[in-house]
Amino acid sequence: EAEVVVLGAGVAGLTLARLLWERGRKVLVVAEALGEASRPPVALVNPLRGRRFTLAEEGERALAAALAFYGRFVPLHLGVFRPVPEEDRPKVAGRLSRLKHRWEKEGVLLEEAFWLEPRPLLARLAEGLPLLRGRVLAWEPPWLVLEGGGRVRGEVLVYAGGGRGAHLLGLEGRHVPGLVLTLLDYFPRAVSYRVYLAGAALGGSYLPGEEGYRLPPPTEGEVEWLLQGAEALVGYRPRVA
């Protein structure tokens, strides 16, 4: 038992658990393993999203909080370059007034957006936290039922298990699968438009969103779409590892 049981040990779940634990709360994290969907080689933290350049809700505040928190645990690679078509520049400029940025010939550099490596971040966030490794089979309020017959409950249950376990609590949502390729080339400054390049990773979301969770295998069309997007950004096709 604990005051707060966090179901899921990805970046979201471990961040919440660590913040509560640092404030003296009795916390227990329940997960099969560290990470799940939070284990790609690179994670991009960028408040200006998509081809429509939508500023995330409370994007400025969230970015400042992410810089301050994640920077305690792992190196942050500052700067995300967003190519911006000429016709979109007035619209984008109006959304950047409170973000530190610099216009360049082809677009805008978000100077405090960044990328990081999630795997060392997960390990550092988990240090010292009470972590129960196990597969959750069901939610029978107030109990989480684990494989093997174990049961866990908390005064508060926080779900942070992503799309894979959402059915346990009857949660619904739109799931958008993505693909990340590991590269032989290295991009110290992230660049993002349709796809993103950062460090030794190329990623993006090619498939349409779905109501139910599934993990589709990569397709030749998806890989080709990523490589075409990368070529449009940097003028050549990066080498895939």
Predicted features, each with a name:
Residues 2, 147-156:
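Core beta-strand elements of the Rossmann-like FAD/NAD(P) dinucleotide-binding domain
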Residues 49, 187-241:
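Active-site lid/adjacent beta-loop-alpha segment flanking the redox-cofactor pocket in flavoenzymes
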Residues 42-107:
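Dinucleotide-binding Rossmann-like beta1-alpha1 core, especially the glycine-rich loop
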Residues 22-41:
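Glycine-rich FAD pyrophosphate-binding loop
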